[in-house]
Every structure is written in structure tokens, then in C-alpha cells.
UniProtKB/Swiss-Prot annotation:
Protein name in UniProt: Argininosuccinate synthase
Species name: Salmonella typhimurium (strain LT2 / SGSC1412 / ATCC 700720)
A Pfam family the protein falls into: Arginosuc_syn_C
Subunit structure comment from the entry: Homotetramer.
Keywords: Amino-acid biosynthesis, Arginine biosynthesis, ATP-binding, Cytoplasm, Ligase, Nucleotide-binding
Subcellular location(s) per record: Cytoplasm
Length: 447
């Protein structure tokens, strides 16, 4: 059985991930007119720029959908977002600012939950709006087939018949109007935006050029912190975790993770926290550029890692960062539920996140400017009295340190001999050995 269908399978049921925008609206109407039986599935991901979810399935029915369903994905999305924070599953970082993989997390949830809903309806062909140059086409392909082994893929944007007839937004708008729908194109922005409750992605068009900065972006989850006319008063915030799970913000305990994430977004968004500008490597190894918002994820991540550094030892923290980067890359590639990802997730959540209990107090200012004011946890291995510079009772003596210096640094002789060997081989010279003031002596010794 062919997995990817290049042309419309007339007479068959096709599930389309329906956003209600021009692209999917025109595609749904076109498929119905060409003899297919479209079913529309809309994911409620808590998008900050969506006002009326209930209206989307109604529009799908007007455009010819056999049936239209709204699937609430918010709870699962937030659960995966918290798991990503617990595991540090983020691999794109520039200048200390992190991309929190919010789009890959959204695709993992959408790709599995929508296809599961389609399977319930006996729909085994899936279409969506992803293009062949991007990451999403592969993410949806993997998650869809993972959920339904019998799934076939039909994408209008890979169908030459569709492209020839409706290859651009102007053509799609004219098509909708000609069919009796007063569909006016939204005002063209200088970039495109995709969002869910965890974060927003701004990319393409003017943002493909690196001389276009964050200043052309209108944030949908935060504020223009770079604009000095925007008043942003400093704010003190507390974040509490219990066994790796965020449970309270500013002393308010949340039993609903969705409400907790919404509040974290509001708090961080007031300051523009979590915005970053990234050049990244797509799955196909071509570089792309995006400007990202993730105020709630950033707030929780900062507090989580503060507790992490005070609770776990150096080697555990190193493994957390190393394994987290590996996991972040797998998430980005659409492999969040693959065995290698589950193995990394299990270890990080079981042995690292389970010990993260405590409260962090921060002062948020503008953008990513903040200070940590206090860190409290019964699990802290940081003990001020152990290394106090003041006179008093100590857990170890000067003699203990002398022994440690002797035993820990027995390799100094070996290192000296290595440098001598490098100089003798001509690999180190006085002109090249910056930071090694004794290299001339080594050269003389070599002679």
C-alpha cells in the first residue's frame, strides 16, 4: 500500500487538520468539489491568537466537511511541556537564550490525538497544511503512522493539480469568493506565526533576512520589551515545584496544569520573558531562522534549573544537560515517543526530576532580564556552612585539604612531561603556546 498519495483519492474519506485559515478552508472546499469526502479535525491547543474555537468546526461544515470535530489537546500539551522542562529537552540555545521546542511539542500532541480521532471515525487518510521544505511534514508523518499503521497521507500542497489551480493565497481567496463565501484575506504580515499554549513561532517572509530583527514582531504572548515607551514595572514572583512538578505560582496552588500554564504565561508575558532569536538546523539539515515566545515555559525552566543546581551533584547535572540536549533533538525531529527518547525521559524524570522540590523567588524586569532572590528546598545539598569563609567549625581541616591537593593532582608530573614531549616534537613553540609561559624552558630542555 502506498503511504503517500500524490493525487486526490476521489470518493474516499480524508481527514484534514483544519485550522479555519485560508489554506485549509480552500483545501477542504476544493477536495469536496473534486469528489473526496473530507472530515475536519481541529486541535484546541490553547492558541493565544484564537478567539472562538467553536466557530471553526461550524465553518468546516459550511465548506463541505462531512463531519467536523474539535479535539481538546490542552491537557496533553501541557503535560508534554512539563515533561520537557523536567528533562531539559531543549537543544537550540543562542547566547544563553533557549528555544523551548514549543512547536515540536505541539506537533507531537496534534499528530497523535487527531489521527486517533480520525481512526475512531474510520478515516485512514490524513492531510494537513505542512509544506515539503519544513519540519512539520516529517513530524506529522511519523506521529500519524505511529498512531495508525494503516494511515495514508494526502497533502494538497504536494498535489500538482491543487497547486496548478490554487497555488497561492490570492488564488485561494478568489476561489472561496467564486464559490459564494465572502472570504477576505487577512492583512498580510511581514512574517508568519504559529502558536499553541506553550509558545509562539514567528518565521518566514521578512524574518528570513537576518537584517530583520525582533523589532518587526508584534508579540502575541508578551510585550515589546525593547520599546522604551512600553512601561514594564519589576515584579517579584515565586515558583514552587514538588517532585519535579510545578504546583504553585505566587503562593497560589494549582490542581489544573492548564490553568497553571496560563498563569505562568501571564506572569512571564508581562515582561516579555522567554523571547529568543534562533538560527537552527531543520531536519533536512538546511538552516532556518525563527523568533520565539514562551513566557510560561521560560519562567518554569528558570526556577526548575535553579533548584536542580542546588539539589543534584555535578555529574548528575552534567548528565541532565547532555541527555536533555539529545532528547531535545529527538523531540525536534518528531521522535518524542521513540524508544531512545522514552529511555532518556524515564531516566531524567525518575532520577532527576523526582528530587526537585522547593520554591524559587525571582524578580522579573524587561525581557530576559531577571534576578534570583531566594531558593528554598529541604533537598538542597548546597550548605553555606560547608564552605564559609568565616572562622568557625568546619567539616574539614587545613590538613585535609593538603592531602586532597596531593592526591588529586598527582598527574601534574604527567602533564609536565606531556608538554615537554609536545615541545620536542615541534608541536609547541614560544610563538604558538599562548598561555604557556614556560614553553621556552621546555624548548631549551628539548634541545
Amino acid at each position: 500500500m502506498t503511504t503517500i498519495l500524490k493525487h486526490l483519492p476521489a470518493g474516499q474519506r480524508i481527514g484534514i487538520a483544519f485550522s479555519g485559515g485560508l489554506d485549509t478552508s480552500a483545501a477542504l472546499l476544493w477536495m469536496r468539489q473534486k469528489g473526496a469526502v473530507p472530515y475536519a479535525y481541529t486541535a484546541n491547543l490553547g492558541q493565544p491568537d484564537e478567539d472562538d474555537y467553536d466557530a471553526i468546526p461550524r465553518r468546516a461544515m459550511e465548506y463541505g466537511a462531512e463531519n467536523a470535530r474539535l479535539i481538546d489537546c490542552r491537557k496533553q500539551l501541557v503535560a508534554e511541556g512539563i515533561a520537557a522542562i523536567q528533562c531539559g529537552a531543549f537543544h537550540n540555545t543562542t547566547g544563553g537564550l533557549t528555544y523551548f521546542n514549543t512547536t515540536p511539542l505541539g506537533r507531537a500532541v496534534t499528530g497523535t490525538m487527531l489521527v486517533a480521532a480520525m481512526k475512531e471515525d474510520g478515516v485512514n487518510i490524513w492531510g494537513d497544511g505542512s509544506t515539503y521544505k519544513g519540519n512539520d511534514i516529517e513530524r506529522f508523518y511519523r506521529y500519524g503512522l505511529l498512531t495508525n499503521a494503516e494511515l495514508q497521507i494526502y497533502k494538497p500542497w504536494l498535489d500538482t493539480d491543487f497547486i496548478d489551480e490554487l497555488g497561492g493565497r490570492h488564488e485561494m481567496s478568489e476561489f472561496m469568493i467564486a464559490c459564494g463565501f465572502d472570504y477576505k484575506m487577512s492583512v498580510e504580515k511581514a512574517y508568519s506565526t504559529d502558536s499553541n499554549m506553550l509558545g509562539a513561532t514567528h518565521e518566514a517572509k521578512d524574518l528570513e533576512f537576518l537584517n530583520s530583527s525582533v523589532k518587526i514582531v508584534n508579540p502575541i504572548m508578551g510585550v515589546k520589551f525593547w520599546d522604551e515607551s512600553v512601561k514594564i514595572p519589576a515584579e517579584v514572583v515565586t515558583v514552587r515545584f514538588e517532585q519535579g512538578h510545578p504546583v504553585a505560582l505566587n503562593g497560589k496552588t494549582f490542581s489544573d496544569d492548564v490553568e497553571m500554564m496560563l498563569e505562568a504565561n501571564r506572569i512571564g508575558g508581562r515582561h516579555g520573558l522567554g523571547m529568543s532569536d534562533q538560527i537552527e538546523n531543520r531536519i533536512i539539515e538546511a538552516k532556518s531562522r525563527g523568533i520565539y515566545e514562551a513566557p510560561g515555559m521560560a519562567l518554569l525552566h528558570i526556577a526548575y534549573e535553579r533548584l536542580l543546581t542546588g539539589i543534584h551533584n555535578e555529574d548528575t547535572i552534567e548528565q541532565y544537560h547532555s541527555h536533555g540536549r539529545q532528547l531535545g533533538k529527538l523531540l525536534y525531529q518528531g521522535r518524542w515517543f521513540d524508544s531512545q527518547a522514552l529511555m532518556l525521559r524515564d531516566g531524567l524524570q525518575r532520577w532527576v526530576a523526582s528530587q526537585i522540590t522547593g520554591e524559587v523567588t525571582l524578580e522579573l524586569r524587561r525581557g530576559n532580564d531577571y534576578s534570583i532572590l531566594n531558593t528554598v528546598s529541604d533537598n538542597l545539598t548546597y550548605k553555606a556552612e560547608r564552605l564559609t569563609m568565616e572562622k568557625g567549625e568546619s567539616v574539614f581541616s587545613p590538613d585535609d585539604r593538603i592531602g586532597q591537593l596531593t592526591m588529586r593532582n598527582l598527574d601534574i608530573t604527567d602533564t609536565r612531561e606531556k608538554l615537554f614531549g609536545y615541545a620536542k616534537a615541534g608541536l609547541l613553540t614560544a610563538s604558538s603556546a599562548t598561555g604557556l609561559p614556560q614553553v621556552e624552558n621546555l624548548e631549551n630542555k628539548g634541545k
